[in-house]
């Protein structure tokens, strides 16, 4: 999955893609964010980048037929994004356009168009306001929905999180305790045994299995917790 954006939507594109690895334990390559002007454009304006069709085309070289390219623009017209869409078409890659202008070129060129018509901005032309907020919500829905479909959650729990700091370790303990219906101390003890693998700890506690056997059972079910816990049931 590739998020590509013009200058004004740069922060949301990078932020959303960078949150996927710690939240869902996916590879950084699974959801990538690219912006007109590259990494320099995260903090500084790179003038002319969003008007460069060839730059968008070359930046999208990472795309293949197995990907989905999501292009984001309030106006729906940056040439940079037209380059991304052209590259996607050339490699038979599916495309989604997120825009706030139903008459823009993105609405014409993208395979699936999500258009949030938010009306005039409080400050005319400042698309970081209503347009940016609406597009950020849409982007969150897309990535979160995709992660749910691929088994990265159980009910409303982020059971694939990476417990890399104290806040996330505390969250992991609470998730394991609640799903496995055990005390926080039992949840912590099991998490310590399995290197903070939340799904492994849940399986070990709920199914009374050892750590390695729990990992094996998860692998048999493609790493999807709900398939294992509800084996034989409709999920």
Residue positions per predicted region:
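Short, amphipathic alpha-helical interaction segments embedded in low-complexity terminal/linker regions
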Residues: 65, 146-235
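Glycine-rich phosphate-binding loops that contact phosphosugars or nucleotide phosphates
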Residues: 11-137, 146-150
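Alpha-helix N-cap/loop-to-helix boundary motif
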Residues: 126-134, 138, 157-164, 168
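Short, flexible active-site loop motifs that bind/organize anionic cofactors or intermediates
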Residues: 3, 46, 71, 177, ...
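Single conserved hydrophobic/aromatic residue that forms the stacking wall/gate
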Residues: 1-10, 14
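Conserved RecA-like P-loop NTPase ATPase core
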Residues: 7, 70, 214
